[in-house]
Amino acid sequence: MLGVKIGNIHTYDDWKLILTKVEKSFPEPKTETQEVPGMNGVLDLTESLSDDIKYKNRMLTLTFNMINNRTRWDTLLTEIENYLHGKKMQIILDSDKFYYYEGRCIIDKFSSNKAIGTLVIKCDVSPYKYELDTGGAWLWDTFNFRNSDIYKTKFTIDGTQQITIVNGREITSPTFVCDAPFTIKFGGVVYKIEAGTRKILDIRLQEGNNDFIISGHGNLEIRFRRGML
């Protein structure tokens, strides 16, 4: 039975809630415009303020039916409210199992008749959803062959090697984890890192292919969150 994983709880497996509707709003772009006298339209400064379009949060609205013993509804509602109401949670839809959302959840309303209770949970989530296993091992049971690819992020370098990192829609800075010193060339700029963990904020992974030239001898992992709208 399809449901939603909220934190460590699955809405059907743990609570026997029947998911009847999922509503997802589209995140509104944060635009910046100025009126200029004598100019048609407006001056759009949105992309000039940062290296990517920024978005407001989106809303996930999840509607469930309760069909278990009516005498347990109050007890179950108390359990659900204590577990998630007002809390920031990770949300994974069974229909989109390769990604997770992050946001704050509330119980919006509950109504009932003699046979069925209806529960609405709303989650104010970040605009991007993120791949569950970006930068690490991926699992067959969450892998979606239609919408996802297998991306290599761990490398053994012996000399100089060109590697390609495939990023999603959100522009982001990666973290490098290595067991030896390396020289990294990206976008015409050379960076030198020592063994250990280092996030390089000046490196901005663009959507699609990002090519690096790596020099050194050892193991290198590139970690980042691959965000999709």
Where do the model's predicted regions map?
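Solvent-exposed loop and beta-edge segments used for protein-protein assembly and interaction
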Residues: 54-58, 83-85, 113-115, 168-170, ...
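Short, acidic/charged, Gly/Pro-enriched secondary-structure junctions
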Residues: 65-106
